[in-house]
UniProtKB/Swiss-Prot annotation:
UniProt-annotated stretches for the region Disordered: 1503-1528, 1989-2012
Gene3D superfamilies: Leucine-rich Repeat Variant
The name this protein goes by in its record: HEAT repeat-containing protein 5A
InterPro entries: ARM-like, ARM-type_fold, Laa1/Sip1/HEATR5, Laa1/Sip1/HEATR5-like_HEAT
Similarity comment text for this entry: Belongs to the HEATR5 family.
Keyword set, alphabetical order: Repeat
Mapped HEAT repeat ranges: 795-836, 1059-1096
One family name in Pfam for this protein: Laa1_Sip1_HTR5
Ranges of compositional bias, category Polar residues: 1512-1522
């Protein structure tokens, strides 16, 4: 079906036939729209004639609405790009079609298409069409009179386009068009009204009379248009009226427009006439006085409200900021006008409208500074009004006092003002602090003064406003609560004061859970005491007994929101209060009933309702305290409470209506409580409660129109769309709900339920809006009915349901509908409860009453009832779970649908088919499914009834969604049906289009990933889906457009390649600023998904749209400058919908993740502009003058705000929440760069790479911006932003601290920003700063000090002084009163101690690791800490003790100190735990360092008794502070401190939480390492073997759980310290025994150590085994081939080089293994030796690899060192185990010898293996290597190396032999000398014929001579002459004569010099042999003389080079080389 898009394609329309004609035409028209803008004009002209002919054929072919729009666009584009010669013929043709007398429905589409074409032609060509427009306009206006609704709407839209195209040229027709549009503005068709409003909006741009002489009449007709209007009409007409009024006030823009300019007061007066307007018409007006304001009036009021907002938004934020007082005054005058508040319903609607006006203008258009001023203005209004009220109320003259009407008016004004003030406070957050501190404004006093207002509504509004203050500024919670308590106590005799201040206190208590810093724990006790006092004194005076009773229980109920921690201590008192408020026995209740009067019963019922409300609050908020015991103590009042429930009807009959309200409230509270309690707890009262429930449900006190409050519990959320668009989310939801619920419900309000004031509002609401008790009691009753009926005996259930059936039969009309809805709600709740508990309905007789209830509503007239009935049918089938029953119901619906012709039956039964699928998980029968789909298909094509179509399509969408693969056979037919309906259905039926959209969405889901397929069928289906989406996107209804975007989003998810982003992204950009919330939500959800995959492409397409200037792209932000990212950021300040805001943020984060690195400058600049938009630049300049470029400072106006002045509708500056998000984005960018690595954190490299590749960017180049942004955020007025700013600063310090400054070597790049950092953190240490900000600042300070950036003492001291200030606060924290919770004090104290700990750790670690150059700086840092170390150490230990106590299991709770710990109180222990969790690890490490460095030496006794050195120490654990303790010995203190540190460490390391950060684990291990480095702990753990074993076991477990190499290395270091401690202990015991027993018994000494006499090492009781397991764990993990099991049986597997971390781990493990024999007894050493030798030799075999330069790897070096330690162990010398050691070592040698023959991947290093053999030769017992076989094998290995061609190997072999030849035991050396010396001599003698060619060869010869010299000195005297002679011969052979010396190569000359030098020294040592040799060999003598002569000659010109003279010793150069490598 898809047309080729390579060029212009023509279509022969005449040849097309149905049914494919419509689709083919639509596709061709879409193809033209895409192609025409991109092809050349010449090509268009070439094909113009054919194109026009085909388009005219389409016009005459009865096109549907989508084709009509495309046809008009293409026709206009062809003429605008081609020739215009034939356009007049086309216009005439269109006019002829319009004038046609054919009025048949089939010809109507052609007429509508002609009208559309005319409009498009005139809009595109404009004045080119000359004067033809007058004929066209008159023709259209003439036809308009007789046109039907679609025609009238299309003509209005066409006239709008004509006006836009012609501009001022159409002035002659303006009046005619105006008259026609005015009449259409009140058309009965809503779509015509919308079109007329659009037409007039276009007209007003040129027709000055509209906002001049005709303004009043236009306003009047607009108000009339609002009557009976829809939501869309109200928006359109309000937009017209608001724009016209704004134009009227702004005045004429051109000289010819001479209309009078209106004043603001005149405009507001015009708008107010509509707002206050009653019903138009004489007869309808009378109803207002009798029955209240009608719905029609409310329509007008809603429209006027929207017009107010459009008017103000058109004038813009700057205008509003100047005119806030006027707007406030006018708005509040409106609400005080008697016409606006004629009755409660009217007043509620008016209040809602005024609040909406203020919120949409003051709340959205103003920046933060302007909002602060607006808040000040509102406060002034409130103050003046309260002064008036106070003055009048205090006036004793009754005639001049306020009448009731005046009080009512003032209350509504106050409610609106206070609500807006509260919303402003919530939006401003902590920024409003300066306003609240301003005494001249007196905000708090003003708001609190309203608490004494006579009206309850005003008092509630004041309370809620104060709640907003507290949520914004938590520091005021405690002070304001104190003020309320004080006023309550002082003014208990004033009913208004008791009510007002108790409400305020209750709302404050309810808001404390939103304040993370809380309030002091004692406030709960104070409030509880006050509440008890109010309840106890309530009966003293009847004048205020009701208020005191209400206030007491309200305070108790709100107290429950503080949670179990506060309530637990008051629980006993609460239970007594609850018990005392109800009679104890039924007899007491009966006695009560006989006494009292109406007022007494009113107070009693209010009190008991309050008690029940407090119980409900307790159960809701303190569930943790609901133990079985508490539940049993809570239940006794219930039977009497239920008994009183049954008495209420008789009491009401007795005392009249005065008890009605409180009895309804009592019922409501009791029902709500019973719903929360387990039904079994009141089982004996089931019947009594059920009787009352049925009575309530069958006599509801509301009109049926107000039943919407029950819909959420009855209908499925997906089905609510069938009830109308009012149930959809929209920006005007609050006001629209007031209209929706107007029939019988006066809107939700706090005065209907005082207990709602301490609850949280629903999402999207700023204030809770409980419904009146008459409605709430029905809600609670229906919920409780469902629960109780499910728990009642099955035999009683049918009777109860039958009662409902009978009750319905006994009522009629609207009353019957109310009862039916109550019954359906109850039945639905019952069925839901059964389904959730997986219970069955029960016996068959239950079905009859259920079906009776359902059948009665399924065919009723009420939409709501039908929806409820359908839902109940499905749920009934679900719980019956009987296929026969289900089939019968389905068949009954089929039959009904076949026979019934009425709309009601067809809608309800069609929906039944869908909902049955929903609750049965799809009907798994293809036959059933085919029948359902067939029926619904036919109903969906019933064009005579849009309602039937809507319901049938909705049901079809449900079936499609739930049928799974069974639906696949119906996809093609359903798609065809959808497309046909979309093409043909009129836009005037948007509900049908919405159902089509839901159906398409379900189809796309059903197709799923198959949409990616390439088959013909799938390709066709995919094309159909895309076509349907495009049609929906062009629908005028916003919900349909949103569905189209959502469907495209689904298609993109399943088949991303087939969704064209170049067309989708522009559409999304156009709708970003749509006035419709659902559309914006769909756009952002789609963008979020696109950004996850194709962020860069989306950004590019958006920028293309901005640059090309899309005609529909109208937004305040300049996308061309800011890109899509900047526009999205601006939305954060415009939007209030939480879901939409989340989508915006996620989209931005995805885009940043994708493009952040490639567009780093763009992101940083944009984020910086947001942060700069409202920053204090003076503050920035004060610390940054040297670092800020003047040009940059001058450009402080950001790109986000620079273009604001250019547009009237200017945007506000970014709010604090937006700035917080921007700062979080900065932090994420830093993290991104960190993950990317590279040059982002290296200035020199970044500058170099930037020079080479200018397009690349690096973070380090923007460091100045990062610091600046962090500073701006950290010093902002918003506390939340300060937190994020400090976090960003911390991140910058961590990432850039080590970056050097390339321009100044030896300096760091951050040094230049010291002033900025200090200025950023200093404000956080002010006394009025919240503790969380101070805690974060402490973290920054510690990181800054520890970073090493600060080097000067003065700079260090400035930062240290800040920490010192906090430390002083910590010391007196317990004695200082705080406005925050005690846990917050603990948080701040621990943060300070943690900061000091981190600085101390850094100073101590640098002392060990830094170079000498940095020692001076480090000493300064350490000295700063040392000065406070005595104080800090005591506080650190106290904090650690607290942490140890708080980590005890719950079973040990009784052992915790009753007064709490050093930094927490017992009541806030749960809240303090997280703070300890964050801080304990660094404190533990610092404490360990301090203890180990001081050697566990205590301070002097005088100091020890001081307050600071031992505030809380382990010796006082669990003791009260006041008790006097005897001084413990230093040993005891040391022991307890040691166990405190060790206990915390072991407890954590035993099983660290999965989410525990790695830093916490490493800190803990470092603490252990530091602790065990001290002498005292080392000695202690050495003596306690069980403790050492346990600690090693814990470390072993940690190794198994953590793969981090850092952790593993630390574990091994700690393990080594433990082994060393045990080693020292064993050594000390042996030394002591040696001293005690004397030398004569030395053979008995080595019995110390593990293994004793038996040699047995028991796992779990052996430190050696534990350490062995620890090391084995590491070795096997790094070298699996060590384990035969892991390596598949072979001892040696693959040998692969290890990484550096692995090498360190292996080396460290071997170091521990080598020490293990020293821990054993001789017998024990024999037990462990085989394993040790196996592991060490195995490591040697597996890691030794030959390198070209001959260097050894770390594991090899460590293995050789370990081998030496083991082989030379004293245990090998002990007689009783010497033989065993010898055998085992011989086995090891044998294994080593076999290493030469193993098959390996890498060539083994012979030198390493020879070194190992040499170690055995030199260090082991002589008998180990005395075995002839081993000797021969060893000799053979040395011979091989001597003969090696590798000089490096030869050299090292010679050196090894040198150490062997020096061995003092001749028996060891002899075999090697005999075998190897001749071979060495032969090798050296070859030098005469083959001179050395390299330094290595030269060194080999030199080393060989040294070896022979050693032999000469070691040989016996009688054999020495011959050896000397041989050596002299050899040395002389090295010499060159005088002829050869001059031309000799360098190395030959070096050998000559070496020989000559050696001869000199050696000859002097053996002169006799030398003279004898010279005398007997003239040849040698002459050679020597020639060499000497030549040498003399060479000395003359230059001094001899000493480069090789030292070669005789050889070692220095080689040693240097080895060390270097």
């Amino acid at each position: 079906m898809e047309l080729e898009e390579r060029g212009l394609q023509l279509l022969d329309v005449a040849e097309l036939e149905e049914p494919q004609r419509g689709l083919r035409v639509l596709e061709w028209l879409r193809h033209l729209r895409r192609v025409l803008p991109v092809i050349t004009r010449a090509e268009i002209k070439e094909n113009q004639k054919q194109l026009v002919e085909q388009l005219l054929l389409v016009m005459m072919g009865f096109p549907g609405p989508p084709a009509r729009r495309l046809l008009a666009y293409n026709m206009a584009f062809v003429y605008s790009s081609g020739d215009t010669f034939s356009v007049y013929e086309t216009i005439d043709r269109c006019n002829d079609v319009i004038r046609s007398k054919d009025d048949s429905p089939s010809y109507l589409p052609s007429k509508l298409a002609a009208v559309a074409c005319l409009g498009a032609l005139y809009q595109k060509l404009g004045r080119l069409l000359g004067s033809t427009f007058s004929d066209t306009v008159s023709n259209l206006l003439k036809v308009l009179r007789s046109a039907e609704s679609q025609g009238r709407s299309e003509i209005m839209l066409s006239l709008e386009r004509i006006l836009k195209g012609l501009g001022s040229a159409a002035i002659p027709c303006h009046r005619d068009i105006y008259k026609a549009a005015r009449s259409c503005l009140t058309d009965r068709s809503m779509s015509v009204r919308c079109s007329a409003a659009q037409c007039l909006l276009a007209l007003q741009k040129e027709a000055s009379f509209m906002w001049g002489s005709d303004l009043e009449s236009l306003a009047s007709i607009c108000f009339k248009a609002f009557e009976g209007s829809s939501y869309e009409v109200r928006l359109a007409v309000a937009r017209l009226l608001g724009k016209v009024l704004a134009r009227a006030m702004q005045g004429a823009t051109s000289p010819r427009q001479n209309a009078r300019k209106l004043s603001l007061q005149e405009v507001l007066g015009l708008l107010s006439t509509g707002f206050l307007r009653g019903n138009s018409g004489f007869l309808r007006g009378g109803g207002d006085m009798l029955g209240g304001t009608s719905v029609t009036t409310r329509h007008v009021r809603l429209g006027a409200t929207q017009a107010y907002i459009v008017f103000i938004r058109t004038l813009g934020g700057h205008w509003l900021a100047r005119n806030v007082p006027v707007l406030l005054s006018h708005s509040l005058e409106l609400i005080s006008n008697p016409k606006a508040i004629q009755n409660p319903t009217d007043a509620a609607c008016s209040r809602c409208c005024i609040s909406y006006i203020l919120r949409a203008t003051v709340g959205e258009l103003l920046g933060e500074k302007a909002q602060l001023e607006a808040a000040r203005e509102i406060c002034e209004v409130i103050r003046k009004l309260m002064k008036t009220v106070d003055a009048v109320l205090s006036d004793s003259n009754l005639e001049t006092r306020f009448c009731t009407t005046d009080i009512s008016a003032s209350q509504h004004v106050l409610v609106c003002a206070l609500q807006e003030l509260g919303d402003l406070f919530l939006g401003l957050g902590t920024i409003l602090a300066p306003l609240l501190k301003d005494s001249s404004a007196g905000v708090l006093d003003t708001v609190l003064s309203v608490s004494l207002h006579p009206s309850l509504s005003a008092r509630l509004a004041a309370a809620w406003c104060l709640r907003s203050v507290i949520v914004s500024l938590p520091s005021l919670a405690a002070p304001v609560l104190d003020r309320c308590v004080e006023r309550l106590t002082a003014l208990k005799s004033s009913p208004e004061a008791v009510s007002g201040y108790s409400l305020t206190a209750a709302v404050l208590l309810g808001s404390i859970r939103l304040c993370p810093l809380g309030v002091p724990h004692g406030k709960g006790k104070v409030v509880m005491s006050l509440a008890k006092d109010l309840l106890c004194t309530a009966s003293q005076n009847s004048r205020f007994s009701l208020q005191r009773t209400q206030a007491g229980w309200l305070l108790i109920a709100s107290l429950m929101t503080l949670g179990p921690a506060v309530v637990q201590s008051q629980l006993g008192c609460l239970l007594l209060l609850w018990r005392s408020v109800f009679p104890v026995t039924p007899k007491d209740l009966d006695t009560e009933r006989r006494r009292g009067d109406a007022f007494t019963w009113q107070v009693t019922l209010e009190g008991r309702a309050g008690a029940l409300g407090a119980m409900r609050s307790f159960v809701s908020h303190c569930g943790e305290l609901m133990s079985e015991e508490v539940l049993q103590r809570l239940l006794p009042p219930l039977p009497c409470a239920i008994a009183l429930l049954t008495l209420l009807p008789s009491l009401q009959k007795l005392y009249g209506n005065s008890l009605k309200a409180c009895s309804v409230l009592y019922r409501q509270r009791l029902y709500q409580l019973l719903v929360l309690l387990p039904p079994k707890t009141y089982e004996e009262s089931f019947c009594a409660v059920m009787k009352e429930l049925v009575a309530d449900l069958t006599s509801p006190d509301y009109s049926p129109g107000g039943a919407a409050f029950l819909l959420s519990s009855v209908c499925h959320p997906d089905d609510l769309v069938l009830l109308g668009p009012s149930f959809q989310e929209c920006d005007q939801r609050a006001t629209e709900e007031e209209l929706l619920l107007s029939s019988g419900i006066p809107g939700g309000s706090l005065e209907y339920d005082l207990h709602a004031i301490y609850e949280l509002p629903s999402e999207g609401e700023s204030v809770p809006k409980p419904l009146p008790s008459a409605f709430t009691v029905i809600q609670a009753a229906s919920l409780l009915f469902g629960t109780l009926l499910a728990h009642m005996p099955e035999s009683q259930r049918p009777q109860i349901l039958q009662q409902l059936v009978e009750s319905i039969k006994q009522t009629k009309g609207s009353r019957q509908q109310s009862v039916q809805l109550c019954a359906m709600s109850s039945l639905c709740n019952f069925l839901k409860h059964l389904a959730s508990s997986r219970s069955n309905l029960g016996p068959e007789e239950m079905r009859k009453p259920c079906l009776s209830l359902i059948q009665a509503v399924l065919e009723g007239n009420s939409l709501w009832l039908r929806c409820a009935g359908v839902e109940s049918v499905a749920r009934l089938v679900q719980v019956v779970d009987d296929p026969t029953f289900t089939a019968g119901l389905i068949q009954a619906s089929f039959d009904k649908l076949k026979t019934a012709r009425d709309v009601v039956a067809r809608t309800s039964h069609s929906l039944v088919l869908g909902t049955l699928h929903r609750y049965l998980g799809g009907i798994n029968s293809s036959q059933h499914l085919a029948s359902c789909v067939g029926v619904l298909h036919s109903l969906s094509q019933d064009t005579t009834s849009p309602e039937v179509q809507t319901w049938a399509l909705h049901s079809l969408s449900v079936i499609t969604d739930l049928s799974g693969p069974l639906f696949n056979v119906h996809i093609e037919a359903t798609l065809s049906l959808l497309l046909t309906a979309l093409i043909t259905t009129s836009p005037s039926h948007p509900e049908v289009h919405r159902s089509l959209g839901r159906c398409l969405s379900a189809l796309v889901t059903a197709l799923g990933p198959e949409l990616q397929g390439n088959g013909a069928v799938l390709s066709s289906q995919r094309t159909s889906c895309l076509l349907a989406c495009s049609v929906m996107q062009e629908n005028p209804d916003c919900l349909v457009q949103a569905q189209g975007i959502s469907c495209l989003q689904q298609l993109h998810m399943y088949a991303p390649k087939h969704v064209n982003l170049s067309s989708l992204v522009p559409t999304l950009c156009v709708h970003l600023y749509s006035p419709h919330l659902p559309l914006r939500r769909a756009v952002l959800a789609c963008l979020r998904q696109l950004a996850q995959r194709e962020a860069a492409e989306v950004s590019e397409h958006a920028m293309t749209v901005a640059k090309e200037g899309h005609e529909d792209l109208k937004m305040e932000m300049n996308m061309r400058e800011l890109g899509l990212e900047g526009v999205l950021l601006s939305l954060l300040d415009r939007e209030s919908d939480q879901q939409l805001l989340r989508d915006v943020k996620e989209t931005l984060l995805h885009m940043q993740n994708c493009t952040g690195l490639s567009r780093l400058s763009f992101w940083l600049r944009m984020l910086k502009d947001i942060l700069s938009a409202s920053a204090d630049f003076a503050a920035v300049a004060s610390v940054d003058t040297n670092q800020e470029d003047e040009g940059e400072v001058a450009c402080s106006d950001s790109v986000l705000t620079s273009s604001k002045a250019e547009s009237l509708g200017s945007s506000v500056t970014p709010h604090w929440k937006t700035r917080i998000f921007a700062m979080e984005c900065v932090c994420q960018l830093i993290t991104q760069c960190e993950l990317d690595g590279g040059a982002h954190f290296d200035m020199a490299q970044a500058q170099e790479m930037k020079h080479k590749e200018p397009e690349r960017d690096f973070l380090v180049l923007h460091l100045q911006d990062l610091i600046r942004m962090s500073f701006m955020a950290a010093t902002d007025h918003s506390e939340q932003l300060r937190l994020v700013g400090l976090q960003a600063l911390l991140l910058v310090i961590h990432r850039f601290a080590a970056v050097p400054e390339p321009e100044f070597p030896g300096h760091l790049i951050l040094e230049q920003f010291q002033a900025n950092v200090l200025a950023a953190v200093r404000p956080a240490f002010n006394t009025d700063t919240p503790p969380d900000v101070t805690a974060r600042a402490c973290e920054v300070c510690s990181a800054w000090l520890a970073s090493g950036v600060v080097k000067e003492l003065a700079d260090l001291q400035r930062v240290q002084q800040l920490l010192l200030t906090s430390l002083r606060r910590v010391q007196v924290a317990k004695e200082t009163a705080s406005v925050y919770s005690e846990s917050t004090t603990a948080m701040e104290s621990l943060a300070v101690l943690k900061a000091w700990a981190e600085v101390y750790i850094a100073a101590m670690e640098k002392q060990v690791t830094q170079s000498k150059m940095a020692e001076a700086q480090n000493e300064v840092l350490l000295s700063l800490v040392q000065a406070e170390l005595l104080t800090l150490s005591g506080l650190w230990l106290a904090a650690l003790q607290d942490h140890a106590l708080l980590t005890l299991p719950a079973a040990c709770a009784s052992q915790l100190p009753s007064q709490g710990g050093g930094f927490y109180t017992a009541e806030t222990s749960d809240a303090a735990r997280p703070h300890y969790l964050l801080s304990w690890a660094p404190i533990l490490h610092a404490s360990s360092l301090w203890l180990s460095s001081s050697g566990f030496v205590l301070p002097d006794q005088d100091e020890g008794n001081g307050h600071l050195s031992r505030p809380v120490t382990p010796t006082s654990m669990g003791q009260e502070r006041g008790s006097q303790l005897p001084a413990d010995s230093p040993e005891d203190l040391n022991l307890e401190r040691f166990h405190l540190i060790l206990g915390i460490s072991v407890e954590f390391l035993c099983c660290p939480p999965v989410d525990a950060p790695m830093e916490r684990i490493t800190s803990c291990l470092r603490a252990l390492k530091a602790l065990l480095s001290g002498m005292w702990p080392k000695a202690h753990i050495g003596t306690d073997q069980d403790l050492a074993i346990e600690l090693i076991s814990v470390l072993h477990r940690l190794l198994l759980m953590r793969e981090s190499s850092e952790v593993q290395l630390l574990v091994l270091e700690v393990g080594r310290l433990i082994v060393n401690a045990a080693q020292d202990h064993v050594r000390e015991r042996r030394r002591s025994a040696e001293v005690d027993d004397g030398a004569e018994e030395k053979e008995t000494l080595p019995v110390f150590g593990e293994g004793h006499d038996t040699g047995g090492l028991v796992p779990g009781h052996s430190l050696v085994v534990a350490a062995l397991e620890l090391c084995l764990c590491i070795l096997i993990r790094q070298l699996p081939q060590l384990s035969p099991h892991l390596s598949g049986g072979s001892v040696v597997g693959k040998t692969e080089p290890l990484f550096s971390e692995a090498r360190l781990l292996v080396a460290s493990s071997l170091g521990i293994l080598a020490e293990l024999p020293s821990l054993c007894s001789p017998e024990g050493s024999v037990s462990v030796l085989p394993t040790l030798l196996y592991l060490v030799v195995g490591v040697l075999q597996d890691t030794t690899v030959k390198f070209p330069d001959g260097h050894l790897t770390l594991p090899v070096t460590a293995a050789l060192q370990a081998l030496k330690v083991i082989v030379s162990s004293p245990m090998s010398q002990v007689e009783k185990c010497r033989a065993s050691w010898t055998r085992l070592m011989q086995s090891a040698v044998s294994t080593l010898l076999n290493s030469w023959h193993l098959e390996r991947q890498l060539v083994p290093d012979s030198v390493s293996l020879l070194t190992a053999l040499t170690i055995f030769l030199l260090s082991a017992n002589p008998e180990v290597m005395s075995d002839p076989g081993l000797q021969n094998a060893c000799v053979q290995r040395f011979q091989n190396s001597i003969d090696s061609k590798n000089p490096t190997e030869q050299l090292k072999c010679y050196r090894l032999l040198l150490s062997i030849f020096k061995h003092p035991v001749p028996e060891v050396v002899a075999p090697y000398v005999c075998s190897l010396a001749p071979r060495i001599m032969r090798h050296l003698s070859q030098a005469e014929s083959r001179k050395p060619q390299s330094m290595e060869e030269l060194l080999v010869l030199q080393e060989g001579v040294n070896l022979l010299k050693t032999l000469v000195s070691a040989v016996e005297e009688q054999n020495r002459p011959s050896m000397v002679c041989m050596l002299l011969h050899l040395l002389i052979s090295f010499l060159l004569d005088e002829n050869a010396l001059g031309s000799a190569p360098h190395y030959s000359r070096a050998l000559h010099d070496f020989g000559l030098h050696s001869l000199t020294s050696f000859g002097a040592s053996y002169p006799t042999q030398f003279r004898k040799l010279m005398g007997s060999s003239p040849a040698l003598r002459s050679r020597l003389e020639a060499a000497l002569r030549g040498n003399q000659e060479s000395l003359k010109p230059k001094a001899p080079s000493r480069g090789t003279m030292g070669g005789g010793h050889g070692s220095p150069s080689i040693q240097l080389k080895t060390n270097f490598l």
